[in-house]
């Protein structure tokens, strides 16, 4: 068996990783601490459930298999600095060997009940807020919706043999939102805004390259566009109009701090850093659907444009010393990387915490470009 409290910290610190697990009102940590092989927690954005995976040493054969549906509460961090990471419902149990280990998988959302029921519902002359409110009430969830979504008018939309999670995800994607279930709440927020559903700004976190073990930065030009076009039909004129949204040209960024071992590229490589993640000049994405109003076309174009901008650049960063306090939508500023990386504002889109005897406590961040302060122009 293993003693988790003696794990070394890669960064050379003296802190010891720690965790606490509760089942109902019972603290089961003392029974599991010496059996802990590894613990992984993935904190997702969107309707994809957060996933907790626990692997325990069962070489003596004394562990009992937990019942599916059991609710587990996790606290994670360092000795004296634990963070409440929420409740998870056990939905998968596996036992393998030799050596014998028990692996328990639990998720933040229990999809076995009403959430997994396919429905046939028509919504007519409604608003986005009223529709999402109905869904939250059906699922027994408290709705928190970011400003700007509730009043959006929807003439008609059908939910045809579709589960509520699938339907609300479709709605969120269409109107540039993200639908998330956390702690009994349905959050309908604007991804990449750096704000909570309440509208409160999340403080920016500063991270340096020296805090990490690994990183990966990639620009995918095949998904890069100058703008998005959406067509809408004017019934009064019997004419199709085009609404186009594109990014305004941005002045080059000031030079950022670079890693001491990094080689300086030629000066011309920095000339257009302000447009480094922008699309090609003549590349436009045309939406195939013809919308029934200019407002609907605008909303669809804005949503698709935001989605594209967030997907152009991929940046992952593994922190050698785990940060249980970090969560999706947190704004991040980094330093010590290439200039174009340091000069960009980032938003956390996914967090994976790993705790093991072998590697200690690490946190891997998936980040995307923060587009909340990017300026756009409309072309009609």
Segments predicted by a language model, with ranges:
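Sec-dependent N-terminal signal peptides of Gram-negative outer-membrane/periplasmic proteins
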Residues: 58-60, 78, 82, 93, ...
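Amphipathic, non-transmembrane alpha-helical segments in extracytoplasmic/periplasmic proteins
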Residues: 53-54, 106, 120-144, 159-182, ...
């Amino acid at each position: 068996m293993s003693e988790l409290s003696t794990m070394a910290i890669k960064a050379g610190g003296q802190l010891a990783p720690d965790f606490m697990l509760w089942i109902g009102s019972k603290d089961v940590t003392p029974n599991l601490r010496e059996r802990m092989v590894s613990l992984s927690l993935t904190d997702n954005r969107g309707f994809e459930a957060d996933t907790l995976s626990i692997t325990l040493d069962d070489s003596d054969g004394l562990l009992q298999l937990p019942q599916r549906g059991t609710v587990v509460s996790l606290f994670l961090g360092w000795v004296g600095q634990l963070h409440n990471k929420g409740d998870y419902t056990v939905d998968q149990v596996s036992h393998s060997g030799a050596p014998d280990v028990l692996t328990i998988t639990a998720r933040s959302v229990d999809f076995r009940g009403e959430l997994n029921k396919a429905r046939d519902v028509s919504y007519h002359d409604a608003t986005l807020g009223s529709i999402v409110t109905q869904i939250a009430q059906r699922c027994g969830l408290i709705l928190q919706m970011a400003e700007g979504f509730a009043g959006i008018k929807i003439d008609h939309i059908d939910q045809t043999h579709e589960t509520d999670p699938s339907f609300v995800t479709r709605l969120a994607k269409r109107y540039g939102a993200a639908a998330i279930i956390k702690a009994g709440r349905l959050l309908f927020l604007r991804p990449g805004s750096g704000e909570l559903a309440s509208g409160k700004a999340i403080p920016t976190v500063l991270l340096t390259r020296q805090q990490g073990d690994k990183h990966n930065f990639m620009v995918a030009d095949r998904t890069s566009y100058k703008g998005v076009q959406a067509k809408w039909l004017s019934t009064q004129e019997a004419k199709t109009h085009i609404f186009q949204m594109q990014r305004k040209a941005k002045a080059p960024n000031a030079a950022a701090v670079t890693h001491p071992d990094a080689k300086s590229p030629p000066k011309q490589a920095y000339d257009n850093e302000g447009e480094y993640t922008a699309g090609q000049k003549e590349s436009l994405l045309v939406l195939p659907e013809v919308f029934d109003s200019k407002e609907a076309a605008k909303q669809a174009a804005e949503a698709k444009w935001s989605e594209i901008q967030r997907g152009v650049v991929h940046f992952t960063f593994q922190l050698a010393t785990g940060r249980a306090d970090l969560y999706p939508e947190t704004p991040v500023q980094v330093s010590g990387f290439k200039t174009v990386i340091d000069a960009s504002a980032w938003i956390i889109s996914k967090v994976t915490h790993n705790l093991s005897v072998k590697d200690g406590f690490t946190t891997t961040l998936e980040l995307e470009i923060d587009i909340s302060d990017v300026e756009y122009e409309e072309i009609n």
